[in-house]
Amino acid sequence: MTRMLLMGPPGSGKGTQATRIADKLGIVPISTGDIFRHNVKSMTPLGVEAKRYIDNGDFVPDEVTNRMVADRIAQADAEHGFLLDGYPRTKGQVEALDAMLAEAGQSLSAVVELEVPDEELVERLLKRAEIEGRADDTQEVIEHRLDLYHRETESVIQEYVERGIVARVDGTGQIDDVTERLLQAVYSVRSATGSLPVIQPGAES
């Protein structure tokens, strides 16, 4: 049973790769962005609570985010494994995820981080902003987002490095090439830990 995290900065192509890798591994991709949108749109109690913070321009507390994630990974389609995209982002969220999994007698199989140079990320995000008409996404704003990502996730990545379940993957180049590298990384971690099903590089689902 595969339970993994896919991490990467804004503009790294993480969302696209999460769907592709989850499909290859036969597990469900779970994006925290999608979880938030679903809860807010459906006006669930957690969604109403989160929207109150968002409307006030405040960060949604870890407690609310953790409960949303716990509810999502407890659903039937995640029973046979999942790929989490966008969570955890803080040490507190790492501890919360550990507790969720421990309660179910589970643990994380792998953490894969997509690495792309900041210069390329800025270029990608500026191009996306131009195409989508996001006038507020200036270079200064984008660089701030990237700096925030690096500061937020450094301790999270280090925590998982110490557990021996992290693989870092070059996120530059063609989408198919990045997917292949990710599959190779997952296979490598599986070989080292014995915690993932055998997914040979280049294998089709």
From Swiss-Prot:
KW ATP-binding (keyword) present: yes
Subcellular location: Cytoplasm
Main location: cytoplasm
Gene Ontology terms: biological process: AMP salvage
Entry keyword set: ATP-binding, Cytoplasm, Kinase, Nucleotide biosynthesis, Nucleotide-binding, Transferase
Catalytic activity reported: AMP + ATP = 2 ADP
UniProt keyword S-adenosyl-L-methionine present: no
Binding residues annotated for AMP, in chain numbering: 32, 37, 58-60, 86-89, 93, 134, 145
Subunit structure comment from the entry: Monomer.
UniProt domain comment: Consists of three domains, a large central CORE domain and two small peripheral domains, NMPbind and LID, which undergo movements during catalysis. The LID domain closes over the site of phosphoryl transfer upon ATP binding. Assembling and dissambling the active center during each catalytic cycle provides an effective means to prevent ATP hydrolysis.
Protein's recorded name: Adenylate kinase
Organism the protein comes from: Micrococcus luteus (strain ATCC 4698 / DSM 20030 / JCM 1464 / CCM 169 / CCUG 5858 / IAM 1056 / NBRC 3333 / NCIMB 9278 / NCTC 2665 / VKM Ac-2230)
